[in-house]
Amino acid sequence: MKFYGMLFDKNADSLFTRIEQDYQHLKAVAKKLPQGLSVLTERKTGSVWYVPGGRSTIGILLKDANARYVFEDDLHSGSLAMSPEQILSKGKDIDVWAFKYFGGAPLTRAQLLQEYDGYKALHCFVHPQIYEVDTSTEPYFELTSFHPEILLREFILLSHPADHAKFSKYAKDIRKLGALRFYHRQLQ
């Protein structure tokens, strides 16, 4: 952000400082909560399921959200190309599944099963905790690149649902964070 400010002769310091303060505040809020639910991101593409490495931006955001990320111990800073079988063996007990897609209409569980029947082995598929963001209608990439605090807030809310028994003691604090901005719960 500061780099773009220098390119266009704008002062980006105050905006960067505000974003950093918001991020650190949200990180502190998440740290006070019990560890969140387990989260799996993305979905199968062809014969590969790409997931963020444990040291990737998304991996760090999930850690800062105090979520349990399946690949949090991984040392890669980029994407991991895994077979669906590897994902299912490591992540079959996942609580929350959050992914991005480009489509114009919400994906249904039936459509996901047409894409890959193995999804039904995921705990979060059987006990639906599926969240999706349609990048054709939401400015996800445009905003989250410069506003990581928005994505951190999303991951806190996804991994600490206020209506979950584990977090009922903290429901008031969680609800103060507001509603999800990008991710929408899949209802079908």
Language-model segment annotations:
Residues 46-49, 70-75, 138-145:
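Active-site rim elements
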Residues 58-79, 98-101, 132-134:
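His/Asp/Glu-enriched short active-site or ligand-binding loop at hydrolase and phosphoryl-transfer sites
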Residues 82-93:
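Short helices/loops that flank or line small-molecule/ion binding pockets
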Residues 4-11, 23, 27-30, 43, ...:
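Sec/Tat-exported extracytoplasmic proteins
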Residues 32-35, 63, 89-91, 122-126:
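Extracellular/periplasmic catalytic domains that process cell-envelope and extracellular macromolecules
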Residues 1-11, 18, 99-188:
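Structured C-terminal subdomain patch of bacterial secreted/periplasmic proteins
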Residues 11-65:
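Basic- and aromatic-lined ligand-binding clefts that recognize polyanionic substrates
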